[in-house]
Amino acid sequence: MGLGIDILKISRISRLIQRSPEWEKNFLKKCLCENEIKKYNLIKSNSSLPRLSEQAKWLAVRWCVKEAVFKALQPNFRVYMSMMEYVRTPTGYPSVVIHDPRFPLSPVMVSVSHEEDLVVANALYLPSMPKT
């Protein structure tokens, strides 16, 4: 079993992605999987959500959740943010899946909350019990 928590200021992510297109691109590669990069680019190009604050919040949630998951999986599993995907279960609960065949892990349960400039996330990893 593993438990992780992280807290992050959304403004920190906002400043980072405003530095330059190259900084933003490198940040996306570091913290998002391919599916999430596609979703982010759709959000960014969507005229109904052009605000930088919404983009930064979307990214901050993923960074914070993945950092909490990273902590929950330590020291047994060395996974990177780009291997993780923040998803919703069929019942609507937030979760993280690991996209790497070397890590046949159960999905990690997460909880995330944001208020004003802060995002907080916690993660709980419960290894699957062997079938008897």
Curated annotation (Swiss-Prot):
Q: Does the keyword Phosphoprotein apply?
A: no
**NCBIfam families assigned to the protein according to its UniProt record, in alphabetical order:** pantethn_trn
Keywords, A to Z, come to:
Fatty acid biosynthesis, Fatty acid metabolism, Lipid biosynthesis, Lipid metabolism, Magnesium, Metal-binding, Transferase
EC numbers, comma separated: 2.7.8.7
Q: Summarize the record's disruption phenotype note.
A: Extremely slow growth at various temperatures.
Listed under catalytic activity are: apo-[ACP] + CoA = holo-[ACP] + adenosine 3',5'-bisphosphate + H(+)
The keyword DNA damage is annotated on this UniProt entry: no
GO CC terms: mitochondrial matrix
Sample GO molecular function, one term: magnesium ion binding
Q: Which Gene3D superfamilies match?
A: 4'-phosphopantetheinyl transferase domain
Q: Tell me the superkingdom of the source.
A: Eukaryota
Chain sites annotated for binding Mg(2+): D6, E67
Q: Which family is this sequence assigned to?
A: Belongs to the P-Pant transferase superfamily. AcpS family.
One GO biological process term is: fatty acid biosynthetic process
The gene from which this protein is expressed is new8
The record ties this protein, via InterPro entries, to: 4-PPantetheinyl_Trfase_dom, 4-PPantetheinyl_Trfase_dom_sf, ACPS, Ppantetheine-prot_Trfase_dom
What role does this protein play? Transfers the 4'-phosphopantetheine moiety from coenzyme A to a Ser of acyl-carrier-protein.
This one is known as Putative holo-[acyl-carrier-protein] synthase
**TM helices/strands, residue ranges:** none
